């Protein structure tokens, strides 16, 4: 048993017999009344996100999660197949378990998979990835100095907002947590 002081982003909690991972947390000490911890947790199996509040000092049940290196192999319908890079075992995760990470994963990309009792829970990506723009509207001559953006489709099929001067075939760095354009990559 742990207490609410142990709550951090990424901690896996066992609530009502289900595993939930902490997405956001905030310790609140109001001027009147006792302190509490406000959290946003995500069900690791269904992907459902809910707000949950705990009284400060309350006992919570945490679960040990093993994070191991895997390689993303391919998508099979609504499932995603990964290979453990140490022993070459393959596991399959559902689209709900993979979540928004599917928008930034390329085949043969190295990822981290969180495991609990040998079963895959969710995928963790690096903070940013490099992707190639596969489609975007061409920029106009006067667009280069303004700060506007336009939609662009990257090689995973996901659409992001990029500056007007970027063209098809350009490699860009994308934040995997927010989906924001971070910069152009030059080789």
From Swiss-Prot:
Gene3D superfamilies: 2.30.30.30, Nucleic acid-binding proteins (2.40.50.140). Pathway: Protein biosynthesis; polypeptide chain elongation. SUPFAM superfamilies: Nucleic acid-binding proteins, Translation proteins SH3-like domain. It holds the Pfam family EFP. One of its GO terms (biological process) is peptide biosynthetic process. It is found in: Cytoplasm. GO terms for molecular function: translation elongation factor activity. The keyword Protein biosynthesis applies. Keywords: Cytoplasm, Elongation factor, Protein biosynthesis. InterPro entries: Elong-fact-P_C, NA-bd_OB-fold, Rib_uL2_dom2, Transl_elong_fac_P/YeiP, Transl_elong_KOW-like, Transl_elong_P/YeiP_cen, Transl_elong_P/YeiP_CS, Transl_elongation_fac_P. It comes from the Bacteria. Its main location: cytoplasm. PANTHER family: ELONGATION FACTOR P (PTHR30053), ELONGATION FACTOR P (EF-P) FAMILY PROTEIN (PTHR30053:SF12). Belongs to the elongation factor P family. This is Elongation factor P. It comes from Clavibacter michiganensis subsp. michiganensis (strain NCPPB 382). The lineage of its organism: Bacteria, Bacillati, Actinomycetota, Actinomycetes, Micrococcales.
